[in-house]
Amino acid sequence: MLIHPQFDPAAIRFGSFAIHWYGVMYLLAFAQFLLLGRLRIRAPRYQTLGWTYKDLEDLLFAGVLGVVLGGRLGYTLFYMPGYYLANPLSILKIWEGGMSFHGGLLGVLCALLWFAKKRHTSFFVVSDLVAPLIPFGLAFGRLGNFINGELWGRPTDLPWAMIFPMVDSIPRHPSQIYQLLGEGIFLGIVLWIYSSKPRPIGRVSGLFLLGYGICRFLAEFAREPDAFLGLLGLGLSMGQWLCVPMIILGVYLLRRNSTDT
């Protein structure tokens, strides 16, 4: 049985100034986006369209805004609408926590739509470029969750069960690690390999939606449901229900007829 190390929430301290682990993880996620994105734009499709490193920087800036705004609004709407309707100013208190991946994804989709319109290109050309870069960024986010000892798993007696002392003394699934490995590293490698060859437009995006939806859906069985929501219909969590439309849309994009590469 393992015990969570209870890391200092600050990665670096300079007197009273501290850089928290979340900040470090965000920076690493942004850096990998630019580094791997530089490799992605070397593909013939993007070379033909004249993509440059400046385009990646603009796309990252728009994506960050989408993640923050969408993630926060998604959390307020999907998870705690009653509380935030009664306390609307609390929506601005991002430092208190409360971000939704699915809301962040919707925010990123809006950012991609804006960027595609700005570049006079197809939305799926842009989303196919970005899709293989997202899982590795998510992996850093899940590592941040683990370091901070949050989003822990359900009780279990498996050999690798972990006690999170900040919660209780019950051995639990280290669900953050499951998600890091599944929707992060594994999905990232699959998408990177799949996208290394020319694919019909929308297929890479479809594989991301399907792959993330399945990985997250399965991981939720090991993750402790939100205390204020619990399990919903059919014994599924909110996260699992939000994955259902992702899986359906992913299957549709992978199966639709398209020969344009």
From Swiss-Prot:
<feature type="transmembrane region" description="Helical">
    <location>
        <begin position="228"/>
        <end position="248"/>
    </location>
</feature>
<keyword id="KW-0812">Transmembrane</keyword>
<comment type="pathway">
    <text>Protein modification; lipoprotein biosynthesis (diacylglyceryl transfer).</text>
</comment>
<keyword id="KW-1133">Transmembrane helix</keyword>
<feature type="transmembrane region" description="Helical">
    <location>
        <begin position="17"/>
        <end position="37"/>
    </location>
</feature>
<dbReference type="GO" id="GO:0008961">
    <property type="term" value="F:phosphatidylglycerol-prolipoprotein diacylglyceryl transferase activity"/>
</dbReference>
<comment type="similarity">
    <text>Belongs to the Lgt family.</text>
</comment>
<keyword id="KW-0472">Membrane</keyword>
<keyword id="KW-0997">Cell inner membrane</keyword>
<feature type="transmembrane region" description="Helical">
    <location>
        <begin position="174"/>
        <end position="194"/>
    </location>
</feature>
<keyword id="KW-1003">Cell membrane</keyword>
<comment type="function">
    <text>Catalyzes the transfer of the diacylglyceryl group from phosphatidylglycerol to the sulfhydryl group of the N-terminal cysteine of a prolipoprotein, the first step in the formation of mature lipoproteins.</text>
</comment>
<dbReference type="GO" id="GO:0042158">
    <property type="term" value="P:lipoprotein biosynthetic process"/>
</dbReference>
<dbReference type="InterPro" id="IPR001640">
    <property type="entry name" value="Lgt"/>
</dbReference>
<protein>
    <recommendedName>
        <fullName>Phosphatidylglycerol--prolipoprotein diacylglyceryl transferase</fullName>
        <ecNumber>2.5.1.145</ecNumber>
    </recommendedName>
</protein>
<keyword id="KW-0808">Transferase</keyword>
<dbReference type="Pfam" id="PF01790">
    <property type="entry name" value="LGT"/>
</dbReference>
<dbReference type="GO" id="GO:0005886">
    <property type="term" value="C:plasma membrane"/>
</dbReference>
<feature type="binding site">
    <location>
        <position position="142"/>
    </location>
    <ligand>
        <name>a 1,2-diacyl-sn-glycero-3-phospho-(1'-sn-glycerol)</name>
    </ligand>
</feature>
<feature type="transmembrane region" description="Helical">
    <location>
        <begin position="121"/>
        <end position="141"/>
    </location>
</feature>
<feature type="transmembrane region" description="Helical">
    <location>
        <begin position="94"/>
        <end position="114"/>
    </location>
</feature>
<feature type="transmembrane region" description="Helical">
    <location>
        <begin position="59"/>
        <end position="79"/>
    </location>
</feature>
